[in-house]
């Protein structure tokens, strides 16, 4: 499965380590720029102590190659970097070479979502030595992080045993780009949706959300908050139970669910975001079943990993 960017990346040529450019200048000075080379991207150990990894990020490599050019601002910045002994780190002639340079590479990669193992190539880059070197860091930046996220998501999805998993990770992600990468990789690895609207817009990932504790705290009582949310979102009403007390939240949610039934609607689900999730989700399931509401789904969030999720079904 491959999700292609619907936006054009910017500044990709400088999204690299300094030493890629110093080596490139050295190859240029040594007459090696056209020497043919092959670079293989692989990893040495499976992440998370597991038995496999899930490849991801490869679908964005074509855009990376296409947009990997040094514009005037890039050249100006590179010219401004001082050498330790004085002067500029990069020779004007080399910078002029970069200004007019376009990558000429052949790239083979395993499909995104495929299971991969240590010490086998995930991506093979072939072409002029200088091109292989220039793109190395940016390519690894795409593939390594998304493969890590996809692998973790795959483990979580397997632990969920067919129950839907949604990406709510934006607020803890490593910046805006990190949030997009997480949403993309999670979806490729089996997550059913994301809370990240920008990821939904760019990649076409289904979006999903509930409401926050702040919603409940904005009303005089929890019951008032639940009723207001049911009125505002009757077709996709998911109530968060643990703002104050989960057990009281269960009672209030059941009250609202019955009121929704009387109005011809149905409470879609409830969410629990804290406490002993394994214990509380089971108690909640029993309470809703006993109230004649077996269709109400139970959603859990907050610090969930594959081991916590396994405990929910134990």
Language-model-detected regions and their locations in the chain:
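Ordered alpha/beta subdomains of enzyme catalytic regions
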Residues: 1-235, 262, 266
């Amino acid at each position: 499965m491959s999700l292609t960017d619907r936006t054009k990346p910017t500044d990709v040529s400088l999204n690299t380590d300094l030493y890629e450019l110093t080596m490139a200048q050295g190859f240029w000075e040594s007459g090696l720029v056209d020497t043919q080379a092959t670079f293989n991207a692989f990893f040495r150990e499976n992440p998370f102590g597991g038995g496999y990894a899930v490849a991801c990020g490869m679908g964005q490599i074509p855009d990376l190659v296409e947009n990997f050019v040094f514009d005037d601002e890039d050249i100006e910045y590179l010219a401004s970097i001082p050498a330790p002994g004085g002067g500029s780190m990069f020779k004007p002639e080399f910078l002029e070479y970069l200004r007019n340079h376009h990558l000429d590479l052949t790239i083979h990669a395993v499909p995104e979502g495929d299971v991969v193992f240590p010490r086998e190539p995930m991506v093979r880059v072939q072409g002029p030595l200088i091109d292989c070197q220039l793109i190395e860091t940016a390519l690894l930046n795409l593939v390594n992080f998304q493969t890590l996220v996809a692998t973790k998501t795959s483990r979580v999805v397997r632990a969920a045993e067919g129950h839907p998993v949604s990406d709510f990770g934006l607020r803890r992600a490593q910046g805006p780009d990190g949030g997009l990468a997480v949403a993309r990789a999670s979806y490729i690895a089996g997550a059913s949706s994301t809370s990240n609207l920008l990821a939904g817009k760019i990649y076409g990932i289904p979006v999903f959300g509930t409401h926050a504790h702040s919603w409940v705290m904005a009303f005089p009582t929890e019951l008032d908050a639940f009723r207001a949310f049911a009125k505002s979102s009757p077709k996709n009403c998911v109530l968060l139970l643990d703002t104050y007390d989960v057990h009281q939240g269960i009672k209030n949610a059941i009250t609202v669910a019955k009121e929704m039934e009387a109005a011809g609607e149905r409470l879609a689900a409830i969410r629990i975001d804290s406490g002993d999730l394994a214990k509380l989700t089971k108690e909640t399931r029993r309470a809703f079943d006993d109230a004649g509401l077996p269709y109400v789904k139970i959603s859990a969030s907050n610090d969930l990993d594959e081991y916590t999720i396994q405990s929910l079904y134990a």
